[in-house]
Amino acid sequence: MGIPDLSSGTQTFSSDSEKAECLNNYFCSVFTKEDQNFLPLPKTAHPRMSNITVTCHGVLKLLEGINGKKSSGPDEISPRILKEVRVEIAPILTFIFNQSLQQGCLPTDWLTANVFALHKKGSKTSPENYRPISLTSVCCKILEHIIYSAVSRFLEDNNIITPRQHGFRSGYSCETQLILAINDWSHSFDLGHRTDVAIFDFSKAFDKVPHKRLLAKLAYYGIAGNAFNWIGAFLHNRTQRVVLNGSKSAWSSVDSGVPQGTVLGPLLFLVYVNDIVSDIKSEIRLFADDCILYREIKSTVDSQILQDDINSLFSWSKLWQMEFNVSKCHIMSLSRSKKHVNAIYKLGNAALSAVHSFTYLGVEITCDLRWNNHVATVVKKASNTLNFVRRNLYRCNGHVKELSYISLVRPLLEYATAAWDPYTSCNIKDIEMVQRRAARYVKRDYQRTTSVTSLLDSLHWQSLQDRRRNARLLHFFKALHGYQGLSQLVNDLPRPTRLTRSSCVDVVAFSQLPCRTDVFKFSFLPRTVIDWNSLDTGVRGLSSLESFRQALVGGRSAATSY
């Protein structure tokens, strides 16, 4: 489906060329006009990054990994062609890449982008509801990968990126961020304390990053030498045009932002927002531009501290020219008591609106930390998708039907389930019902006398409840073995005794956590500790993630007959 007629003010745009021009004008209108009276950052105390040298072997490896089906950029150099002639072209690209790094300049074609408009949500007739995705030169992206690898390794090795940031980082994910936040909230809930959560929404965050301020932060964090010079050239003199069904808008200059769709864009954004956590006394959690701030409220002093932290975020946004969308910023109180008086918090001069639920990283959080609403939403979405698949693939064989369920329906039921794994029988039953309907569809058996359990067994499908348990245990295993996202969460667990092996981490059971409420009892940590303790010592002692995964599955990989 294409983009319908667009409306901007009193004007309506119908033809593809008009719509492309309208979208491009809107995308350019949100760029930041940077304040040149910039207060420099203090002299850096971070080590300086060394120069990058590109090797032919590294370029060849990246060329081998190219997805030949991806689109080319404005230079129209096909990724499929690059992959096919990789052996011949790798030495040439290596020379060009090293020259580009040494001279700190890029070919003009590398600074252009064909922009495609991706609908987010809301009315499709409004340009404001589209996100610009840049298609750039594939050759440039290969060099971006090399620079990304070097810069991200430097930042991680020197512990520069805050551990509160879980976006675009190896070992971190939406799920790890959700697990940590919900663990904090449910534990406070268990103790009878109220937690006030402030939810912030940046307006066009990736498009508004001012370039000079970004370069100043890169220098402050130690990004130096040819990488720094190259990134500066990468951001300077960029142009873009919107492409829609073959129609193209006029070229426009890109005055701010990190281009969405590039390799370096997400990493540059992480660097830019990294110091937002400075001087914050409450708990702050980031996933790229998603930001929440929360604190246990035991007295008015805590409310004032949270307000001071909100003020700090507002001051940061003004200094670094990043705007909050105040109408989408909210406050929510998590509490066992229904009689507490909500405090009033302000972002600048605007009071934050109080809500009883909000969606964080794709999961609906309610003020009582129950999962009824989220389960209902997930089940409805998965059921609608299953119905769509059934209507369109009813003539296909069982193998195709099974693949359609596994790839299109089940992921909707299992997104981030380690964080919100439901425990009430009604929620568990509602989720399992979708899979039971899918089993009948795959097996083409709708007879009332047929046991659905036998159909599930013949398909070798684990129950979704068991799969959620395994997902939690896998996260727990990763945390024990030093994967970044959750390592601190399990490091603080009490261990009654200590049994060690030379080749792996501890295999001892952990002490169970005291719980007063079901909300905390069935949250990730207390629940998974019990599940971990129930595993055989031999399974707990495995050092390989894949071996541990296979042990949990328990040999359910047999072929299915249809």
Task: Locate the predicted segments by residue.
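A glycine-rich beta-turn/hairpin centered on an aromatic-Pro dipeptide
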Residues: 332-338, 435, 456-508
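Surface-exposed loop/turn segments and immediately adjacent short secondary-structure elements
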Residues: 1-129, 134, 142, 248, ...
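Active-site palm subdomain of RNA-directed nucleic acid polymerases
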Residues: 147-165, 190, 266-295, 396
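Short, conserved micro-motifs composed of acidic
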Residues: 49, 246, 308, 323-357
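Catalytic palm active-site di-aspartate
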Residues: 73, 112-115, 131, 165, ...
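Basic, alpha-helical interaction scaffolds
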Residues: 281, 350-419
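Conserved pre-catalytic core of RNA-dependent polymerases
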Residues: 20, 27, 45, 49-259, ...
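Catalytic palm subdomain of template-directed nucleic-acid polymerases
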Residues: 83, 204-221, 291-315, 336, ...
